[in-house]
Protein backbone atom coordinates (compact mmCIF):
# COMPACT_ATOMS: atom_id res chain seq x y z
CA UNK A 1 0.00 0.00 0.00
CA UNK A 2 2.83 2.39 0.82
CA UNK A 3 4.49 1.70 -2.53
CA UNK A 4 1.26 2.43 -4.39
CA UNK A 5 0.89 5.75 -2.57
CA UNK A 6 4.43 6.70 -3.49
CA UNK A 7 3.81 5.83 -7.12
CA UNK A 8 0.63 7.93 -7.22
CA UNK A 9 2.40 10.77 -5.50
CA UNK A 10 5.21 10.53 -8.05
CA UNK A 11 2.80 10.57 -11.01
CA UNK A 12 0.80 13.60 -9.88
CA UNK A 13 3.31 16.31 -10.81
CA UNK A 14 4.09 14.46 -14.05
CA UNK A 15 0.40 14.52 -15.04
CA UNK A 16 0.22 18.15 -14.04
CA UNK A 17 3.29 18.86 -16.15
CA UNK A 18 1.73 17.10 -19.16
CA UNK A 19 -1.47 19.11 -18.73
CA UNK A 20 0.51 22.34 -18.62
CA UNK A 21 2.41 21.33 -21.77
CA UNK A 22 -0.87 20.63 -23.58
CA UNK A 23 -2.25 24.00 -22.52
CA UNK A 24 0.90 25.72 -23.74
CA UNK A 25 0.70 23.82 -27.05
CA UNK A 26 -2.96 24.77 -27.59
CA UNK A 27 -2.23 28.38 -26.70
CA UNK A 28 0.78 28.41 -29.00
CA UNK A 29 -1.25 26.86 -31.81
CA UNK A 30 -3.96 29.49 -31.44
CA UNK A 31 -1.35 32.25 -31.44
CA UNK A 32 0.24 30.76 -34.56
CA UNK A 33 -3.14 30.61 -36.31
CA UNK A 34 -3.82 34.21 -35.32
CA UNK A 35 -0.48 35.29 -36.77
CA UNK A 36 -0.89 33.06 -39.82
CA UNK A 37 -4.29 34.52 -40.77
CA UNK A 38 -3.29 38.13 -40.29
CA UNK A 39 -3.13 40.42 -43.32
CA UNK A 40 0.30 40.73 -44.90
CA UNK A 41 2.11 43.16 -47.16
CA UNK A 42 2.95 42.84 -50.84
CA UNK A 43 6.58 41.76 -50.29
CA UNK A 44 5.42 38.79 -48.18
CA UNK A 45 3.16 37.34 -50.88
CA UNK A 46 3.99 34.26 -52.95
CA UNK A 47 4.73 35.08 -56.58
CA UNK A 48 1.33 33.99 -57.92
CA UNK A 49 -0.49 36.54 -55.72
CA UNK A 50 1.72 39.48 -56.69
CA UNK A 51 -0.27 41.50 -59.19
CA UNK A 52 -0.20 45.19 -58.26
CA UNK A 53 2.84 46.53 -56.43
CA UNK A 54 1.05 49.83 -55.79
CA UNK A 55 -1.33 48.03 -53.40
CA UNK A 56 1.11 47.67 -50.53
CA UNK A 57 -0.79 46.07 -47.66
CA UNK A 58 -3.93 44.29 -46.36
CA UNK A 59 -3.46 41.07 -48.37
CA UNK A 60 -4.82 37.64 -47.45
CA UNK A 61 -2.28 34.94 -48.28
CA UNK A 62 -2.97 31.19 -48.54
CA UNK A 63 -5.80 31.09 -46.05
CA UNK A 64 -8.03 28.01 -45.60
CA UNK A 65 -11.47 28.09 -47.19
CA UNK A 66 -13.31 28.64 -43.90
CA UNK A 67 -11.33 31.78 -43.06
CA UNK A 68 -11.64 32.99 -46.65
CA UNK A 69 -15.42 32.68 -46.64
CA UNK A 70 -15.63 34.51 -43.32
CA UNK A 71 -13.37 37.26 -44.67
CA UNK A 72 -16.18 38.46 -46.94
CA UNK A 73 -17.43 40.36 -43.87
CA UNK A 74 -14.02 41.76 -42.86
CA UNK A 75 -11.86 44.58 -44.16
CA UNK A 76 -9.00 43.79 -46.55
CA UNK A 77 -7.90 45.04 -49.96
CA UNK A 78 -10.33 42.72 -51.79
CA UNK A 79 -13.45 43.50 -49.74
CA UNK A 80 -14.84 46.12 -52.12
CA UNK A 81 -13.76 44.11 -55.16
CA UNK A 82 -15.94 41.27 -53.89
CA UNK A 83 -18.93 43.40 -52.92
CA UNK A 84 -19.07 45.74 -55.94
CA UNK A 85 -19.72 42.82 -58.26
CA UNK A 86 -21.70 40.74 -55.77
CA UNK A 87 -24.17 43.62 -55.39
CA UNK A 88 -24.10 43.98 -59.18
CA UNK A 89 -25.02 40.31 -59.52
CA UNK A 90 -28.07 40.70 -57.28
CA UNK A 91 -29.03 43.88 -59.16
CA UNK A 92 -29.10 42.00 -62.47
CA UNK A 93 -30.88 39.06 -60.89
CA UNK A 94 -33.61 41.49 -59.81
CA UNK A 95 -33.66 43.06 -63.30
CA UNK A 96 -34.05 39.62 -64.87
CA UNK A 97 -37.01 38.81 -62.63
CA UNK A 98 -38.52 42.23 -63.36
CA UNK A 99 -38.07 41.75 -67.11
CA UNK A 100 -39.65 38.30 -67.02
CA UNK A 101 -42.69 39.45 -65.05
CA UNK A 102 -43.25 43.11 -65.96
CA UNK A 103 -41.91 43.79 -69.48
CA UNK A 104 -44.13 44.61 -71.25
CA UNK A 105 -46.92 45.12 -68.71
CA UNK A 106 -48.84 48.19 -69.89
CA UNK A 107 -49.07 49.64 -73.37
CA UNK A 108 -47.80 53.19 -73.81
CA UNK A 109 -51.01 54.96 -74.88
CA UNK A 110 -49.12 57.94 -76.26
CA UNK A 111 -47.02 55.71 -78.53
CA UNK A 112 -50.08 53.72 -79.55
CA UNK A 113 -52.10 56.70 -80.75
CA UNK A 114 -49.23 58.08 -82.83
CA UNK A 115 -48.32 54.74 -84.38
CA UNK A 116 -51.87 53.58 -84.98
CA UNK A 117 -52.18 54.55 -88.69
CA UNK A 118 -48.97 52.69 -89.60
CA UNK A 119 -49.91 49.72 -87.47
CA UNK A 120 -53.37 49.44 -88.97
CA UNK A 121 -51.93 49.40 -92.48
CA UNK A 122 -49.91 46.33 -91.50
CA UNK A 123 -52.74 44.61 -89.65
CA UNK A 124 -55.37 42.18 -90.91
CA UNK A 125 -58.39 44.31 -89.94
CA UNK A 126 -60.92 41.55 -90.52
CA UNK A 127 -59.05 39.28 -88.13
CA UNK A 128 -58.55 42.13 -85.69
CA UNK A 129 -62.26 42.96 -85.79
CA UNK A 130 -63.32 39.38 -85.08
CA UNK A 131 -60.82 39.03 -82.22
CA UNK A 132 -61.89 42.34 -80.72
CA UNK A 133 -65.56 41.44 -80.91
CA UNK A 134 -64.76 38.17 -79.17
CA UNK A 135 -63.24 40.17 -76.33
CA UNK A 136 -66.20 42.59 -76.26
CA UNK A 137 -69.21 40.27 -76.56
CA UNK A 138 -71.65 42.91 -75.33
CA UNK A 139 -70.78 45.50 -77.97
CA UNK A 140 -73.16 46.00 -80.93
CA UNK A 141 -72.24 43.90 -83.94
CA UNK A 142 -72.64 46.97 -86.17
CA UNK A 143 -69.56 48.57 -84.64
CA UNK A 144 -66.54 48.37 -86.84
CA UNK A 145 -63.05 48.14 -85.39
CA UNK A 146 -61.94 51.29 -87.26
CA UNK A 147 -64.74 53.31 -85.68
CA UNK A 148 -63.96 51.92 -82.26
CA UNK A 149 -60.25 52.69 -82.51
CA UNK A 150 -60.53 56.19 -83.89
CA UNK A 151 -63.43 57.24 -81.67
CA UNK A 152 -61.92 55.98 -78.43
CA UNK A 153 -58.33 57.11 -78.77
CA UNK A 154 -57.38 60.50 -77.28
CA UNK A 155 -57.20 62.61 -80.45
CA UNK A 156 -60.82 61.79 -81.34
CA UNK A 157 -62.04 61.40 -77.79
CA UNK A 158 -64.48 64.34 -77.82
CA UNK A 159 -65.86 63.62 -81.30
CA UNK A 160 -66.80 59.95 -81.11
CA UNK A 161 -70.24 58.52 -81.69
CA UNK A 162 -69.99 56.12 -78.77
CA UNK A 163 -69.22 58.50 -75.92
CA UNK A 164 -71.09 56.28 -73.47
CA UNK A 165 -68.18 53.81 -73.78
CA UNK A 166 -65.39 56.40 -73.69
CA UNK A 167 -66.15 58.67 -70.79
CA UNK A 168 -63.23 58.17 -68.46
CA UNK A 169 -59.51 58.37 -69.08
CA UNK A 170 -59.05 54.98 -67.45
CA UNK A 171 -61.44 53.45 -69.97
CA UNK A 172 -59.29 54.76 -72.83
CA UNK A 173 -56.21 53.17 -71.30
CA UNK A 174 -58.01 49.89 -70.70
CA UNK A 175 -59.19 49.86 -74.30
CA UNK A 176 -55.68 50.54 -75.58
CA UNK A 177 -54.34 47.65 -73.53
CA UNK A 178 -57.18 45.49 -74.86
CA UNK A 179 -56.44 46.34 -78.48
CA UNK A 180 -52.65 46.22 -78.18
CA UNK A 181 -52.27 42.42 -77.83
CA UNK A 182 -54.30 42.04 -81.02
CA UNK A 183 -51.94 44.32 -82.94
CA UNK A 184 -48.59 43.80 -81.22
CA UNK A 185 -46.94 40.39 -81.39
CA UNK A 186 -44.10 40.31 -78.81
CA UNK A 187 -40.85 39.14 -80.31
CA UNK A 188 -38.57 36.50 -78.84
CA UNK A 189 -36.71 37.51 -75.69
CA UNK A 190 -33.83 35.03 -75.78
CA UNK A 191 -31.15 37.54 -76.95
CA UNK A 192 -32.06 39.86 -74.08
CA UNK A 193 -32.00 37.02 -71.55
CA UNK A 194 -28.67 35.84 -72.99
CA UNK A 195 -27.24 39.27 -72.18
CA UNK A 196 -28.71 39.23 -68.67
CA UNK A 197 -27.30 35.73 -68.12
CA UNK A 198 -23.88 36.81 -69.39
CA UNK A 199 -23.89 39.83 -67.07
CA UNK A 200 -24.84 37.74 -64.03
CA UNK A 201 -22.21 35.10 -64.85
CA UNK A 202 -19.51 37.76 -65.25
CA UNK A 203 -20.37 39.55 -62.00
CA UNK A 204 -20.67 36.39 -59.91
CA UNK A 205 -17.48 34.87 -61.39
CA UNK A 206 -15.57 38.08 -60.68
CA UNK A 207 -16.82 38.28 -57.10
CA UNK A 208 -15.97 34.61 -56.47
CA UNK A 209 -12.52 35.05 -58.00
CA UNK A 210 -11.62 37.99 -55.75
CA UNK A 211 -12.86 36.11 -52.69
CA UNK A 212 -11.18 32.71 -53.23
CA UNK A 213 -7.99 33.37 -55.24
CA UNK A 214 -5.85 33.79 -52.12
CA UNK A 215 -6.37 30.13 -51.09
CA UNK A 216 -3.68 28.43 -53.20
CA UNK A 217 -1.91 28.66 -56.53
CA UNK A 218 -4.18 26.05 -58.13
CA UNK A 219 -7.37 27.74 -56.93
CA UNK A 220 -6.01 31.10 -58.06
CA UNK A 221 -5.36 29.72 -61.56
CA UNK A 222 -8.90 28.30 -61.82
CA UNK A 223 -10.57 31.43 -60.43
CA UNK A 224 -8.71 33.79 -62.77
CA UNK A 225 -9.73 31.70 -65.80
CA UNK A 226 -13.31 31.81 -64.58
CA UNK A 227 -13.02 35.59 -64.23
CA UNK A 228 -11.67 36.00 -67.79
CA UNK A 229 -14.41 33.72 -69.14
CA UNK A 230 -16.98 35.90 -67.39
CA UNK A 231 -15.62 39.07 -68.99
CA UNK A 232 -15.66 37.44 -72.43
CA UNK A 233 -19.22 36.20 -71.83
CA UNK A 234 -20.42 39.68 -70.86
CA UNK A 235 -18.88 41.30 -73.94
CA UNK A 236 -20.13 38.60 -76.32
CA UNK A 237 -23.69 38.47 -74.99
CA UNK A 238 -23.87 42.27 -74.97
CA UNK A 239 -23.86 42.01 -78.78
CA UNK A 240 -26.87 39.72 -78.88
CA UNK A 241 -29.73 42.21 -78.26
CA UNK A 242 -28.53 44.99 -80.61
CA UNK A 243 -27.53 42.59 -83.38
CA UNK A 244 -30.59 40.37 -83.21
CA UNK A 245 -33.18 43.14 -82.85
CA UNK A 246 -31.52 45.40 -85.44
CA UNK A 247 -31.15 42.67 -88.08
CA UNK A 248 -33.96 40.27 -87.20
CA UNK A 249 -35.48 40.92 -90.63
CA UNK A 250 -32.14 40.24 -92.36
CA UNK A 251 -31.03 36.74 -91.30
CA UNK A 252 -27.74 36.90 -93.22
CA UNK A 253 -26.29 39.86 -91.31
CA UNK A 254 -27.93 38.74 -88.08
CA UNK A 255 -26.22 35.33 -88.22
CA UNK A 256 -22.98 36.85 -89.50
CA UNK A 257 -22.57 39.29 -86.61
CA UNK A 258 -23.80 36.85 -83.95
CA UNK A 259 -21.51 34.10 -85.25
CA UNK A 260 -18.51 36.43 -85.37
CA UNK A 261 -18.82 37.68 -81.79
CA UNK A 262 -19.54 34.19 -80.46
CA UNK A 263 -16.42 32.75 -82.10
CA UNK A 264 -14.37 35.73 -80.92
CA UNK A 265 -15.60 35.21 -77.36
CA UNK A 266 -14.68 31.51 -77.41
CA UNK A 267 -11.23 32.35 -78.85
CA UNK A 268 -10.66 34.90 -76.09
CA UNK A 269 -11.50 32.32 -73.42
CA UNK A 270 -9.07 29.83 -75.01
CA UNK A 271 -6.28 32.42 -75.10
CA UNK A 272 -6.91 33.20 -71.42
CA UNK A 273 -6.09 29.57 -70.55
CA UNK A 274 -2.41 30.24 -71.28
CA UNK A 275 -0.52 30.58 -67.96
CA UNK A 276 1.32 33.68 -69.18
CA UNK A 277 -2.00 35.47 -69.72
CA UNK A 278 -2.42 36.17 -65.99
CA UNK A 279 1.05 37.58 -65.38
CA UNK A 280 1.28 41.27 -64.37
CA UNK A 281 3.34 41.98 -67.49
CA UNK A 282 0.32 41.04 -69.61
CA UNK A 283 -2.03 43.47 -67.89
CA UNK A 284 -2.07 45.84 -70.89
CA UNK A 285 -2.45 42.88 -73.29
CA UNK A 286 -5.47 41.61 -71.33
CA UNK A 287 -7.09 45.03 -71.28
CA UNK A 288 -6.38 45.55 -75.00
CA UNK A 289 -7.82 42.15 -75.93
CA UNK A 290 -11.10 42.74 -74.10
CA UNK A 291 -11.26 46.34 -75.33
CA UNK A 292 -10.74 45.19 -78.93
CA UNK A 293 -13.43 42.57 -78.51
CA UNK A 294 -15.88 45.25 -77.41
CA UNK A 295 -14.72 47.71 -80.09
CA UNK A 296 -15.68 45.21 -82.80
CA UNK A 297 -19.30 46.06 -81.96
CA UNK A 298 -18.87 49.33 -83.83
CA UNK A 299 -19.56 47.58 -87.16
CA UNK A 300 -23.14 46.42 -86.45
CA UNK A 301 -23.95 49.74 -84.73
CA UNK A 302 -22.89 51.75 -87.79
CA UNK A 303 -24.72 49.29 -90.02
CA UNK A 304 -27.87 49.77 -87.92
CA UNK A 305 -27.63 53.55 -88.24
CA UNK A 306 -27.31 53.33 -92.03
CA UNK A 307 -30.41 51.16 -92.32
CA UNK A 308 -32.57 52.86 -89.69
CA UNK A 309 -31.29 56.44 -89.84
CA UNK A 310 -34.87 57.74 -89.78
CA UNK A 311 -35.98 55.66 -86.78
CA UNK A 312 -35.88 57.45 -83.39
CA UNK A 313 -35.30 54.12 -81.63
CA UNK A 314 -32.13 53.52 -83.62
CA UNK A 315 -30.70 56.84 -82.45
CA UNK A 316 -31.93 56.27 -78.90
CA UNK A 317 -30.29 52.85 -78.59
CA UNK A 318 -27.10 54.12 -80.21
CA UNK A 319 -26.88 56.84 -77.57
CA UNK A 320 -27.05 54.20 -74.86
CA UNK A 321 -24.46 52.08 -76.67
CA UNK A 322 -22.04 55.00 -76.97
CA UNK A 323 -22.39 55.67 -73.25
CA UNK A 324 -21.85 51.99 -72.51
CA UNK A 325 -18.72 51.97 -74.67
CA UNK A 326 -17.35 55.03 -72.89
CA UNK A 327 -17.92 53.44 -69.48
CA UNK A 328 -16.30 50.15 -70.51
CA UNK A 329 -13.44 51.96 -72.25
CA UNK A 330 -12.77 54.14 -69.21
CA UNK A 331 -12.85 51.03 -67.04
CA UNK A 332 -10.28 49.29 -69.25
CA UNK A 333 -8.06 52.40 -69.19
CA UNK A 334 -8.19 52.64 -65.39
CA UNK A 335 -7.50 48.90 -65.09
CA UNK A 336 -4.47 49.03 -67.41
CA UNK A 337 -2.89 52.19 -65.99
CA UNK A 338 -3.59 51.37 -62.30
CA UNK A 339 -4.72 54.88 -61.54
CA UNK A 340 -4.93 56.33 -58.88
CA UNK A 341 -2.84 53.99 -56.68
CA UNK A 342 0.26 54.37 -58.85
CA UNK A 343 0.28 58.08 -57.92
CA UNK A 344 0.11 57.37 -54.17
CA UNK A 345 1.12 53.77 -53.40
CA UNK A 346 -0.47 52.42 -50.24
CA UNK A 347 -3.09 55.17 -49.95
CA UNK A 348 -5.81 53.26 -51.83
CA UNK A 349 -5.23 49.76 -50.49
CA UNK A 350 -8.68 49.47 -48.90
CA UNK A 351 -10.86 51.77 -51.00
CA UNK A 352 -10.55 53.70 -54.24
CA UNK A 353 -7.97 51.69 -56.16
CA UNK A 354 -8.22 51.05 -59.89
CA UNK A 355 -9.79 47.60 -59.80
CA UNK A 356 -12.65 48.80 -57.63
CA UNK A 357 -13.28 51.70 -60.01
CA UNK A 358 -13.13 49.25 -62.91
CA UNK A 359 -15.82 47.11 -61.24
CA UNK A 360 -18.15 50.07 -60.70
CA UNK A 361 -17.75 51.17 -64.34
CA UNK A 362 -18.51 47.63 -65.57
CA UNK A 363 -21.76 47.51 -63.59
CA UNK A 364 -22.71 50.99 -64.83
CA UNK A 365 -21.97 50.02 -68.44
CA UNK A 366 -23.98 46.81 -68.18
CA UNK A 367 -26.95 48.67 -66.67
CA UNK A 368 -26.79 51.22 -69.51
CA UNK A 369 -26.95 48.33 -71.96
CA UNK A 370 -29.96 46.94 -70.11
CA UNK A 371 -31.77 50.23 -70.67
CA UNK A 372 -30.92 50.04 -74.38
CA UNK A 373 -32.32 46.51 -74.45
CA UNK A 374 -35.68 47.71 -73.15
CA UNK A 375 -35.84 50.21 -76.02
CA UNK A 376 -35.08 47.42 -78.52
CA UNK A 377 -37.87 45.26 -77.08
CA UNK A 378 -40.44 48.04 -77.21
CA UNK A 379 -39.39 49.01 -80.72
CA UNK A 380 -39.57 45.52 -82.18
CA UNK A 381 -42.72 44.57 -80.29
CA UNK A 382 -44.47 47.47 -82.04
CA UNK A 383 -42.74 47.45 -85.43
CA UNK A 384 -41.98 43.80 -86.03
CA UNK A 385 -40.23 43.25 -89.35
From Swiss-Prot:
Keyword rRNA-binding: no
Tissue: Expressed in roots, leaves, stems and flowers.
Region Disordered, residue ranges: 1-22
Residue intervals annotated with topology Extracellular: 101-191, 250-256, 310-313
Membrane topology according to the record: Multi-pass membrane protein
Protein localization: Membrane
GO cellular component, one term: membrane
Pfam families: HlyIII
Transmembrane segments: 80-100, 192-212, 229-249, 257-277, 289-309, 314-334, 357-377
Subcellular location, principal: membrane
Cross-referenced InterPro entries: AdipoR/HlyIII-related
Residue stretches of biased makeup (Basic and acidic residues): 1-12
Homology family: Belongs to the ADIPOR family.
Role noted for this protein: May play a role in abiotic stress response.
Name of this protein: Heptahelical transmembrane protein 4
Gene transcribed to yield this protein: HHP4
Amino acid sequence: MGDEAEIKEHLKPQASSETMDKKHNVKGKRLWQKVKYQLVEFHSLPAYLRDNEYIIGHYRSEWPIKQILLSIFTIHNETLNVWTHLIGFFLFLALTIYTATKVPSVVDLHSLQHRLPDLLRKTDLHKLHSELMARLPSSPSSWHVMDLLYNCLPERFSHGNYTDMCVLHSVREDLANLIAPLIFRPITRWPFYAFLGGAMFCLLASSTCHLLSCHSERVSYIMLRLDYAGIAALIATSFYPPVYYSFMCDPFFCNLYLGFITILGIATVLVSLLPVFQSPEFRVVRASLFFGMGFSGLAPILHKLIIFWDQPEALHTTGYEILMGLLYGLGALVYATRIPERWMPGKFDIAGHSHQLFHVLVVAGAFTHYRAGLVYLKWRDIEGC
